């Protein structure tokens, strides 16, 4: 399953930057070589060992556990026997360990706890290097103004305040630390996962690898079909990015899809099972309160969140309050002993433009703010999930209310889709909203693929969704004034104006596609040095004419 990195990203090499506080830190970055290899720029890389051609990966063994020593050296964890899970051995990960890590006392082992106690962890230095390295540019035509350096101390302060998170379960030591917060690069998430209708373990593992190679910062496994536990194990053991899940899906699977048979004990066992596997963040739909359900009655599309609909159905069947809400402190107690991050789910998000910014949506958001306070009291890391389907003129209100209710906890939104009329193109309708909401301060954007509302995404859909959202996140970073975003735009525009076609391809988000589109009309090698393309031809190229004007003036 090794992908040819040199084909996808020509003229790129993997490079590692060492830490200074912790000298055993090695942060992987991608260097793009340009100007006939005389210059280069450094870019953020999410692929881990999957984008290092020097590393041989055996997916049956998983990838290197780069954080294991950092975790053990803190001396606040101990090994426990993993709870037994009935899995189909035919599909099980072959090297599944029976030992897991957990806090050795009642003290939290979260990045927030360390940050609040003035401890800079290796994870904090790691993300500071990742965020800051892009600003260290060796191009001669660099911008004159650079923003202040992102230091490990700044990272610590942001995490202590709750404005940023590092999802990093101690049982996922393979993950390369990354940070989600409005004062950092805008991140993107890719959803994968099987259904009862389609897909296999191999398919989902391949989707994960493609997603991170093209730039997904986190991946959510939303499997609802067969072999949920096994799929997740394969993904986690081979993933260098944080993995998120919606545990209520597997809990419902355990009761054969009968919502009324769910209870907190089943959910709790599922939570611990996934915590022991190494899931880095959980979507918990604890804000769907019984009294809020009636507010969805007049909606055009009702409740469109799967988790939200499950919990609303359960509340209605039993005429009781949401057990995720009533047992929230106990959930916090589990999370803090593994350092699992809350992704507080928007179970009442709007599923159509007609339902955007309604009472149900904002009642739930207010409750998520109250739950954030409770989680922070336990030193648990938190991000807040957001919509959904929102027209452009209503997007800003979502961010303003989230900041107010949730006290600047990172916002994580699904798009939002800005119109409902384009099935098959919802990666575009949503990337428009994602760019806008990212500009307003959303920290992570959950991708939408062309298959949204139509079916289970395949590998090409995953790639298309990731690229669309890398564009949205990058556009938001530009609008926010992030210098690392500006650098790459500047370099590509320089290459374009000077007809350096290979540099233009290689600096793009998808070099393979850029080159293939150019090759459709001008496939010859000579065309790669021509001062025109097939759009204008040699006589009408505005940039060529501009060069001629300059030569006359000189």
From Swiss-Prot:
<dbReference type="GO" id="GO:0005829">
    <property type="term" value="C:cytosol"/>
</dbReference>
<feature type="binding site">
    <location>
        <position position="453"/>
    </location>
    <ligand>
        <name>Zn(2+)</name>
    </ligand>
</feature>
<keyword id="KW-0456">Lyase</keyword>
<keyword id="KW-0862">Zinc</keyword>
<feature type="binding site">
    <location>
        <position position="249"/>
    </location>
    <ligand>
        <name>substrate</name>
    </ligand>
</feature>
<dbReference type="Pfam" id="PF13667">
    <property type="entry name" value="ThiC-associated"/>
</dbReference>
<feature type="binding site">
    <location>
        <position position="285"/>
    </location>
    <ligand>
        <name>substrate</name>
    </ligand>
</feature>
<dbReference type="GO" id="GO:0016830">
    <property type="term" value="F:carbon-carbon lyase activity"/>
</dbReference>
<feature type="binding site">
    <location>
        <begin position="346"/>
        <end position="349"/>
    </location>
    <ligand>
        <name>substrate</name>
    </ligand>
</feature>
<feature type="binding site">
    <location>
        <position position="533"/>
    </location>
    <ligand>
        <name>[4Fe-4S] cluster</name>
    </ligand>
</feature>
<keyword id="KW-0004">4Fe-4S</keyword>
<dbReference type="InterPro" id="IPR002817">
    <property type="entry name" value="ThiC/BzaA/B"/>
</dbReference>
<keyword id="KW-0408">Iron</keyword>
<dbReference type="InterPro" id="IPR038521">
    <property type="entry name" value="ThiC/Bza_core_dom"/>
</dbReference>
<comment type="function">
    <text>Catalyzes the synthesis of the hydroxymethylpyrimidine phosphate (HMP-P) moiety of thiamine from aminoimidazole ribotide (AIR) in a radical S-adenosyl-L-methionine (SAM)-dependent reaction.</text>
</comment>
<comment type="similarity">
    <text>Belongs to the ThiC family.</text>
</comment>
<feature type="binding site">
    <location>
        <position position="412"/>
    </location>
    <ligand>
        <name>substrate</name>
    </ligand>
</feature>
<dbReference type="GO" id="GO:0051539">
    <property type="term" value="F:4 iron, 4 sulfur cluster binding"/>
</dbReference>
<feature type="binding site">
    <location>
        <position position="389"/>
    </location>
    <ligand>
        <name>Zn(2+)</name>
    </ligand>
</feature>
<protein>
    <recommendedName>
        <fullName>Phosphomethylpyrimidine synthase</fullName>
        <ecNumber>4.1.99.17</ecNumber>
    </recommendedName>
</protein>
<dbReference type="GO" id="GO:0009228">
    <property type="term" value="P:thiamine biosynthetic process"/>
</dbReference>
<dbReference type="InterPro" id="IPR025747">
    <property type="entry name" value="ThiC-associated_dom"/>
</dbReference>
<feature type="binding site">
    <location>
        <position position="541"/>
    </location>
    <ligand>
        <name>[4Fe-4S] cluster</name>
    </ligand>
</feature>
<feature type="binding site">
    <location>
        <position position="385"/>
    </location>
    <ligand>
        <name>substrate</name>
    </ligand>
</feature>
<comment type="subunit">
    <text>Homodimer.</text>
</comment>
<keyword id="KW-0411">Iron-sulfur</keyword>
<keyword id="KW-0949">S-adenosyl-L-methionine</keyword>
<feature type="binding site">
    <location>
        <position position="536"/>
    </location>
    <ligand>
        <name>[4Fe-4S] cluster</name>
    </ligand>
</feature>
<feature type="binding site">
    <location>
        <position position="220"/>
    </location>
    <ligand>
        <name>substrate</name>
    </ligand>
</feature>
<dbReference type="InterPro" id="IPR037509">
    <property type="entry name" value="ThiC"/>
</dbReference>
<feature type="binding site">
    <location>
        <position position="191"/>
    </location>
    <ligand>
        <name>substrate</name>
    </ligand>
</feature>
<dbReference type="GO" id="GO:0009229">
    <property type="term" value="P:thiamine diphosphate biosynthetic process"/>
</dbReference>
<feature type="binding site">
    <location>
        <begin position="305"/>
        <end position="307"/>
    </location>
    <ligand>
        <name>substrate</name>
    </ligand>
</feature>
<keyword id="KW-0784">Thiamine biosynthesis</keyword>
<comment type="pathway">
    <text>Cofactor biosynthesis; thiamine diphosphate biosynthesis.</text>
</comment>
<dbReference type="GO" id="GO:0008270">
    <property type="term" value="F:zinc ion binding"/>
</dbReference>
<keyword id="KW-0479">Metal-binding</keyword>
<dbReference type="Pfam" id="PF01964">
    <property type="entry name" value="ThiC_Rad_SAM"/>
</dbReference>
């Amino acid at each position: 399953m090794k992908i040819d990195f040199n084909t996808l990203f020509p003229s790129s090499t993997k490079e590692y930057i060492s830490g200074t506080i912790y000298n055993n830190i090695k942060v992987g970055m991608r260097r793009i070589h340009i100007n006939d290899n005389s210059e280069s720029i450094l870019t953020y890389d999410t692929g881990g060992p999957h984008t290092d051609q020097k590393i041989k990966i055996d997916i049956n063994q998983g990838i290197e556990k780069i954080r294991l020593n950092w975790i053990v050296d803190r001396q606040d964890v101990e090994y426990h026997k993993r709870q037994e899970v009935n899995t189909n051995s035919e599909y099980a990960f072959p090297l599944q360990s029976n030992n897991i890590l957990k806090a050795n006392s009642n003290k939290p082992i979260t990045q927030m706890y360390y940050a609040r106690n003035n401890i800079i962890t290796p994870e904090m230095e790691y993300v500071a290097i990742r965020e800051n390295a892009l600003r260290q540019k060796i191009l001669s035509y660099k911008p004159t103004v650079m923003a202040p350096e992102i230091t490990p101390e700044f990272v610590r302060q942001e995490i202590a305040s709750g404005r940023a998170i590092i999802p990093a379960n101690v049982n996922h030591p393979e993950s390369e630390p990354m940070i989600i917060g409005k004062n950092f690069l805008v991140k993107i998430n890719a959803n994968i996962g099987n259904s009862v209708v389609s897909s296999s373990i191999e398919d989902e593992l391949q989707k994960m690898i493609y997603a991170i190679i093209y730039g997904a910062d986190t991946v959510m496994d939303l499997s609802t079909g067969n072999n949920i536990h096994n799929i997740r194990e394969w993904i986690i053991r081979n993933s260098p990015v944080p993995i998120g899940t919606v545990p209520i899906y597997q809990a419902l699977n355990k009761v054969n899809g009968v919502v009324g048979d769910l209870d907190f004990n089943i959910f709790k066992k599922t939570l611990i099972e996934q915590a022991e596997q190494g899931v880095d963040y959980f979507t918990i739909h604890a804000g769907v309160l019984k009294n809020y359900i009636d507010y969805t009655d007049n909606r055009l599309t009702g409740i469109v969140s799967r988790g939200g609909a499950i919990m609303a159905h359960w509340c209605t069947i039993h005429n009781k309050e949401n057990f995720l809400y009533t047992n929230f402190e106990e959930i916090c107690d589990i999370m803090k002993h593994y350092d699992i991050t809350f992704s507080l789910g928007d179970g009442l998000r709007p599923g159509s433009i007609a339902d955007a910014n309604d009472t149900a949506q904002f009642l739930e958001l207010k409750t998520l703010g109250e739950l954030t306070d409770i989680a922070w009291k336990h030193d648990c890391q938190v991000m807040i999930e957001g919509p959904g389907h929102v027209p452009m003129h209503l997007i800003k209100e979502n961010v303003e209310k989230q900041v107010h209710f949730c006290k600047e906890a990172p916002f994580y939104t699904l798009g939002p889709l800005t119109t409902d009329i384009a099935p098959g193109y919802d990666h575009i309708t949503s990337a428009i909203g994602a760019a806008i909401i990212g500009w307003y301060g959303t920290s992570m954007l959950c991708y939408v693929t062309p298959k949204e509302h139509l079916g289970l995404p395949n590998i090409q859909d995953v790639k298309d969704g990731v690229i669309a959202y890398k564009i949205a996140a990058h556009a938001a970073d530009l609008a926010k004034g992030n210098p690392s975003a500006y650098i790459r735009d500047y370099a590509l525009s320089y290459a374009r104006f000077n007809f350096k076609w290979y540099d233009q391809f290689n600096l793009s988000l998808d070099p393979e596609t850029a080159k293939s589109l150019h090759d459709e009309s001008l496939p010859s090698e000579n065309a790669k040095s021509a001062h025109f393309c097939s759009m204008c031809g040699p006589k009408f190229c505005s940039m060529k004419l501009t060069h001629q004007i300059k030569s006359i003036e000189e």
